[in-house]
Each structure stands twice: as C-alpha cells, then as structure tokens.
Regions:
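N-terminal pre-domain segments of enzymes
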Residues: 25-41
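Short N-terminal helix-initiation segments at or just after the protein's N-terminus
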Residues: 24-29, 96-100
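N-terminal secretory signal peptides and thylakoid transit peptides that target proteins
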Residues: 1-14
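Generic structural signal for short, solvent-exposed loop/turn connectors between secondary structure elements
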Residues: 1, 29, 162-164
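Boundary at the C-terminal end of the N-terminal hydrophobic targeting segment
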Residues: 19-21
C-alpha cells in the first residue's frame, strides 16, 4: 500500500466516522409521531437553568451522585427537562451503582441515538426525540429484559409523580 493509498484510507475512515456520529436514528421504530420542538439558543437559555443548558444543549455531563433523582422511588414518569416529553416510566428505573439515574429501556419513540466519538472509542449517545436535548449514553451492561443501561444526567430530567 502506497503512502497515498494509506492517507486516502485514513481520510475515508475519518469522514465515515464523522457521518456516523452525526446521524441520529430512533431507538425504537414504534410509538406516536413526535413533533419536533425547535428553539433558538437564546430561547433555550431563558427556558433552562445553566446546569440544564450545559447538559441538554452542550452535551455536558453532571457529576456522578449529585442528582436527587437517584433516590426517586415513587411511581411516575421521568420527562425531558427541556420540553416535558415523557421518556421513562418509573418501572424502567433501576439502581445501577453508577451515580446517575439509570433505566433499562425508554418509552417507545421517546429517544433517538447516535454514535459518539468524543472519548475516541465509540459510544451510543441518546437524545430527546422532541427537542434533541442530550440525556446520556446507552451501555450494554444493564439488567434483564434488555441488557441495556440508559445512563441519564439527572439534571436533564424532571420527575412527575403518578396521580393518587
């Protein structure tokens, strides 16, 4: 393989990786059609706290163990803090020991995934299907029945208790 071939191959791989990282696809093909919520950066900053903005709009990560939602055990729904879309039922939550609220699945059609190469090794990142807000990453070390762990930034969620 010549140097030119080698450089061409590396360039192609880089372009393919970037395209893969930017392509969002639904995590589940089922569920109701969700109308997108598109706001300007200024509108998001008015709507969200600085911590929420940092995670939801800038794909940041909150410190492990800091979310009050880690200990949330009531029946209810975990919604996107950016747009109120229900993402997880409380029955989907489990204690992962990671310091972040964790779920073994999401509500149908509620999240979209994409490949994330920020830490060099690819990971699966997930976003709210309505507003595109970053919530966390999906790992393949969760409990049955899915074997998945949706590791969520608590600041990106709000909990709505089930009506009594």
């Amino acid at each position: 393989m010549t140097r030119r071939d080698w450089l061409g191959l590396l360039s192609s791989l880089g372009i393919a990786a970037k395209a893969s990282a930017q392509t969002a696809k639904p995590a589940a093909p089922t569920g109701p059609k969700i109308e997108p919520l598109v706001l300007s950066d200024t509108e998001w900053k008015k709507r969200l706290t600085p911590a929420q903005y940092g995670v939801l709009r800038e794909e940041g990560t909150e410190r492990a163990g800091t979310s009050p939602l880690n200990g949330e055990k009531r029946k209810g729904t975990f919604q996107c803090a950016g747009c109120d879309l229900p993402l997880f039922a409380s029955s989907m939550k489990y204690e992962s020991g990671t310091g972040w609220p964790s779920f073994f699945t999401s509500l149908p059609g509620a999240v979209q995934t994409k490949r994330d190469f920020h830490l060099v090794l690819p990971r699966t990142e997930y976003h709210c299907a309505r507003c595109g807000g970053h919530h966390g990453h999906v790992f393949e070390d969760g409990p049955k029945p899915t074997g998945l762990r949706y590791c969520n930034n608590g600041v990106a969620l709000k909990f709505v208790p089930e009506a009594a």
